[in-house]
């Protein structure tokens, strides 16, 4: 029966010894964000009134990493089992709310599954998420009488007959706050592990005459936990396969779904084509008919209609208007902006720079802290010298400017419309419209000159 309010408890106190890492286990990433963040996001999407995070190992780093989330931090100083962890959070439970118990190392749990679990919880009883496994070794078994759930027996405490049961406990459950506090106060550690098992409350509820309703997830992988890096890598591939399938069904052409990673969210138009080994990070928007070549990384960027990003280009916190082309081997750093029809070629880097409509920087160029007008040609080897060792300065280039190869523009400097900058020029002062600028050293040709000969 659906209660009006619900709080979520996320257990995240484990050290993760088998990860062989100094990083708390739940902070290891899946699809570009910490495992526990996936669970927090699910809790928030469910509309949880409060999210209680039970922590132990690496608490300072957890708090720093998750500082943007509104969490109630609950310390479990000693890891004495799941029941003990819930006991630490129990003082924060309201009697008239539902309490949903989740795990920071079970990152793929689906909101749809949790919604069904919440809706299935009987009045005064417990909603329990279970799955059936061909090999349930190591998991707590679900015991039933006449089809009704009566309890959970941990593998180490189970009889030979009970170990034949294939239905196992996932650890995810929901119960009323007042009931849960009462059951938690009765837990003991009289078992093979010497721990306080949250699973013991199932038998308590049954003995009190309360109903326990079991719900199954849509996919077993939703309840898979992570104890080592191998398991984490497997969940990563499961997650990525699911995301690739959704994109393909929505009309995005992934040339090889097994070689595509989505580490954030992707909004897209029609007829988008993505080649192999492309990584999408953060929030990315691709317009209609966008083409992305192999090996590209796109992060927190907006790519307009009919743009083409050639292989091995990196685009971060950038914006491309319609019909722009970049790469191969181009790098757009935060603040880069290309207006309609602009082109950035191989080994060109932009940061905090705007390239106007139809303007081109074909190769071997750095454009930083710059405003570049329309129909500008930036020759190979051009550098905007924006940093004096202490401060950054801006370069402004007007429309229809031609910048010859191997030129340096020492900021702060403004280049007027229609200016031509001869190859090899170092520009240190502002230039008025339609002027020619050159600062080459005069060429000297020495006839009959011979190279020095090495002494043997």
From Swiss-Prot:
Any GO MF annotation of the entry: UDP-N-acetylglucosamine diphosphorylase activity
Region spans: N-acetyltransferase: 251-456
E.C. number(s) listed in UniProt: 2.7.7.23, 2.3.1.157
Binding site for UDP-N-acetyl-alpha-D-glucosamine: 11-14, 25, 76, 81-82, 103-105, 140, 154, 169, 227, 333, 351, 366, 377
Stretch list, region Pyrophosphorylase: 1-229
Region described as Linker: spans on this chain: 230-250
Chief site of localization: cytoplasm
UniProt keyword terms in alphabetical order: Acyltransferase, Cell shape, Cell wall biogenesis/degradation, Cytoplasm, Magnesium, Metal-binding, Multifunctional enzyme, Nucleotidyltransferase, Peptidoglycan synthesis, Repeat, Transferase
Required co-factors: Mg(2+)
Record field: catalytic activity: alpha-D-glucosamine 1-phosphate + acetyl-CoA = N-acetyl-alpha-D-glucosamine 1-phosphate + CoA + H(+); N-acetyl-alpha-D-glucosamine 1-phosphate + UTP + H(+) = UDP-N-acetyl-alpha-D-glucosamine + diphosphate
Sequence positions that bind Mg(2+): 105, 227
A GO term from the CC aspect: membrane
Cofactor note: Binds 1 Mg(2+) ion per subunit.
Record-level GO BP terms: cell morphogenesis; cell wall organization; lipid A biosynthetic process; peptidoglycan biosynthetic process; regulation of cell shape; UDP-N-acetylglucosamine biosynthetic process
Compartment(s): Cytoplasm
Pathway: Nucleotide-sugar biosynthesis; UDP-N-acetyl-alpha-D-glucosamine biosynthesis; N-acetyl-alpha-D-glucosamine 1-phosphate from alpha-D-glucosamine 6-phosphate (route II): step 2/2; Nucleotide-sugar biosynthesis; UDP-N-acetyl-alpha-D-glucosamine biosynthesis; UDP-N-acetyl-alpha-D-glucosamine from N-acetyl-alpha-D-glucosamine 1-phosphate: step 1/1; Bacterial outer membrane biogenesis; LPS lipid A biosynthesis
Alphabetized SUPFAM superfamilies for the sequence: Nucleotide-diphospho-sugar transferases, Trimeric LpxA-like enzymes
Binding site for acetyl-CoA: 380, 386-387, 405, 423, 440
Entries under InterPro entries matching the protein: Bifunctional_GlmU (IPR005882), GlmU-like (IPR050065), GlmU_C_LbH (IPR038009), Hexapep (IPR001451), Hexapep_transf_CS (IPR018357), MobA-like_NTP_Trfase (IPR025877), Nucleotide-diphossugar_trans (IPR029044), Trimer_LpxA-like_sf (IPR011004)
Pfam families registered for this protein in UniProt: Hexapep, NTP_transf_3
Active-site residues (renumbered): 363
Complex and partners: Homotrimer.
HAMAP family: GlmU (MF_01631)
Function recorded in the entry: Catalyzes the last two sequential reactions in the de novo biosynthetic pathway for UDP-N-acetylglucosamine (UDP-GlcNAc). The C-terminal domain catalyzes the transfer of acetyl group from acetyl coenzyme A to glucosamine-1-phosphate (GlcN-1-P) to produce N-acetylglucosamine-1-phosphate (GlcNAc-1-P), which is converted into UDP-GlcNAc by the transfer of uridine 5-monophosphate (from uridine 5-triphosphate), a reaction catalyzed by the N-terminal domain.
Protein family (similarity comment): In the N-terminal section; belongs to the N-acetylglucosamine-1-phosphate uridyltransferase family.
Protein name according to UniProt: Bifunctional protein GlmU
